[in-house]
């Protein structure tokens, strides 16, 4: 059995997105300050150091394939 909020919340979000947001968004966009969108911090853009790091749980060294065969 599925809990009531698991059914009600997605339905309410769909109703908001489909019917209420087209009327609310134009009003909010006029009031909301655009400074937050225009200010970008470009200090760390493009700086990525992933050498020797685990990605998705796989280490960079050693085999990455998983065997499905049982070993006795």
Curated annotation (Swiss-Prot):
Pfam families (alphabetical): DUF4512
UniProt key word Hydrolase: no
This protein's record includes keyword Endoplasmic reticulum: yes
Region (Disordered): 45-72
InterPro entries hit by this protein: UPF0729_C18orf32-like (IPR026776)
Spans annotated as Necessary for its localzation to the endoplasmic reticulum and lipid droplets: 1-33
Broad class of where this protein is predominantly found: endoplasmic reticulum
One GO location term (cellular component): endoplasmic reticulum
Keyword terms, alphabetized: Endoplasmic reticulum, Lipid droplet
PTM entry text: Undergoes ER-associated degradation (ERAD).
Subcellular location(s) per record: Endoplasmic reticulum; Lipid droplet
Function: May activate the NF-kappa-B signaling pathway.
Family statement drawn from the similarity comment of this UniProt entry: Belongs to the UPF0729 family.
Subunit structure: Interacts with DERL1 and AMFR.
Record-given protein name: UPF0729 protein C18orf32 homolog
Species per Swiss-Prot/TrEMBL record: Rattus norvegicus
